[in-house]
Amino acid sequence: MKYLYQALSVLLIINCGGGGGSSSDSLPVPSQVIAPQPLFKESPIKLIDAVSYYSQACNQPSFQFLIPTKINDDTYIDFIAHFWCDSSTPTEFDDRPVEDALVAYLSDGFGGYNIDNLDVFGSVSAKLGGASRKYSRGDINGDGKDDFAFAMNWEDGRAAYDYDSMVANYAQPSILMSHESGYKIERIGKPDWGHSVQIKGSKVLFGGHSSQAFELIDSTWVDISEQFTDLSFASFLVFDDYIINSVRRNGLQGLELLEKNIVISSLMIEESFKVNFESWNNTGTGNYDELGVYNIRGENYFHGMTTEMCRQDDLIIATINASKLKSGEIIEGGYYSETETDPVVLFAFYQIENKELVEKQIEIIGEEINHNFNFFDCIDVNNDNMSDIVAQVFSQPWNDQDNNQGVPEVYINSGGSYFNLDTSTWPVYSVNDGSQGYLSDVDSNGTFDLVMFPLKANISGDIEIFLSNKNITN
């Protein structure tokens, strides 16, 4: 009986896994659930409101640009901001300069930023000399650093209904030229209603009511405007042998391809009919101008013109800006005010083939045409060696459009087409006001980060940067 008890005891121990067994013989431990890594860090880097700098111009300026660039030697991107002031007497004649302010945000190398205008610009109260409309980036002086050229004007809402009021919107073009520790502000050329600009090597080209071009030779600006006699007010692209111009004249609008200032090819849309139109800076004055209506992709739009272009290898990507009635149909010969319209922006694609402009039928799946914007980037944001499109849309809480709250529209290149990336879970700008944003690799880790800032410093001029943890399409 004693031996039977011992045998049963041994059997019980073996069946229960006791008696010096390894840990692998123990009862299974439930596996730990690891939450997926979020795309962006929870808390943003915040760049302080530069109110003590821009308030010398005005208290609630337009926040036109926040330009990412490298100024100091750490791994983080630095920023140059430009603010300019709206008219205090809109629609009235004014020939005073538009007040403005430049602000340089320098990284401290640890995710923080300080404003240092004195070291970067040589002045606490640095200015470009008016309202900036567009800028172009290049290396004009060949020092390996970014230089910037700005199309400038005094278009702040003042009147523009006759010759005298029109030329009161003119301003001189501006350059930010890099040097060892910062930037020198240079103004070149004649005052104009500057609207477009391109840098091509050591050459800088400006389009306005006239064309201007300059080349930096031995640290001296040389006027070469006679080589570029027809640069578009709206937008142009400069190639080695060609220029592509956005044009609207004689009831036609579209693109022209120029070689040695001669048009060799064009793609044009014919005006459907005319209406009488009161622009935003003439609101309430009763000053109407004739305006063309164009049928684009089966819809009638006011105006319609290519306003921005970029290159992706051989592909030319362009935006057509137009406007539509908020309600009803556009009637030939009718009277309309810009306040009755909503903006529309459509993408179009082109190539140069055998010296001819050819439109390419490339689809953007989920294209959002009702978000207004001026600027977009042609960059590879998901590291697949194909350039994508990032539209810096205006998020405006006062209109009827969906509010992106600072998040750009991101169109991912999938080879033969693009698709609208779902950004619904992305962080948004924290201030409940008009905002805008773009993508940039701020911390130089190879993935793109989300940069957001206001359209105007109505409530705050804070800048918010959400660093990414991974590729934006992972």
Regions found by a protein language model. Give the residues of each.
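Blade-edge motifs of beta-propeller repeat domains
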Residues: V29-S62, L106-G130, Q172-V197, S202-L205, ...
